[in-house]
Regions:
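Generic alpha-helical hydrophobic packing signal
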Residues: 62-66, 111, 117-120, 145-149
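Short, surface-exposed amphipathic charged segments that create phosphate/polyanion-binding patches used
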Residues: 100-113, 158-164
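Short, solvent-exposed coil/turn linker segments
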Residues: 19, 93, 100-101, 105, ...
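Conserved Lys-Pro-Asp/Glu-containing loop-to-beta segment of HAD-superfamily phosphomonoesterases
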Residues: 7-8, 106-131, 137
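Alpha-helical substrate-recognition element adjacent to the catalytic core
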Residues: 2-100
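Short, aromatic/basic amphipathic alpha-helical patches
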Residues: 77-85, 112-115, 135-141
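Acidic, Mg2+-coordinating phosphoryl-transfer loop and its flanking beta/alpha structural elements
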Residues: 121-164
């Protein structure tokens, strides 16, 4: 059961909880899409922070995944079969054709956490590898903060590793 007084944790996927660098190809969006086959997606590797999605959920925290990916059926298969994401965890993902910069996209999609009364007074913690995304999220509201991977790792280990 969700503890409504505790912070809300928002996790990015690529290079934060999942290593998908083998799919980058030449670095273009076209290359990324071409490499987004089931075979390649199933080669993605889980990063250390990925385990905390389930640990935090188990301890009653609201956990959200917010990715800039356009999710394919194989991405969903990976989340549920390899990452073992609980089915009730909200996954915010990009719609086909959405070309906004990642920081603007994520801020727009996560703004409800700062506006809706049930979330407004709770701390929101975004964990993302991208500095521009973290900075934009931190500016979303006074109860919005963002952690890079080293800080998130340190916090998760000190707060939840012993309990996990």
């Amino acid at each position: 059961m969700e503890n409504k007084k505790e912070p809300i944790f928002i996790f990015d996927l690529d290079q934060t909880t999942i290593d998908s660098t083998h799919r980058v190809g030449h670095g273009s969006l076209t290359s990324w899409v071409r490499n987004a086959t089931r075979k390649n997606i199933m080669k993605d590797k889980l990063l250390f922070l990925s385990q905390f999605i389930s640990i935090l959920d188990k301890h009653g925290y609201k956990v959200i995944i917010c990715t800039s990916r356009v999710m394919s059926k194989w991405d969903w298969e990976f989340l549920y079969s390899k990452m073992n994401i609980p089915s009730h965890v909200k996954v915010i993902h990009r719609a086909e054709g959405d070309t906004r910069q990642d920081d603007k996209y994520k801020n727009t999609r996560l703004a409800y956490l700062n506006n809706f009364i049930q979330y407004k007074n709770r701390w929101k913690v975004l964990i993302d590898d991208r500095e521009d995304v973290r900075k934009a999220f931190s500016n979303l509201g006074r109860k919005c903060k963002a952690w890079d991977i080293p800080k998130a790792t340190e916090k998760m280990l000190s707060e939840f590793w012993v309990r996990g």
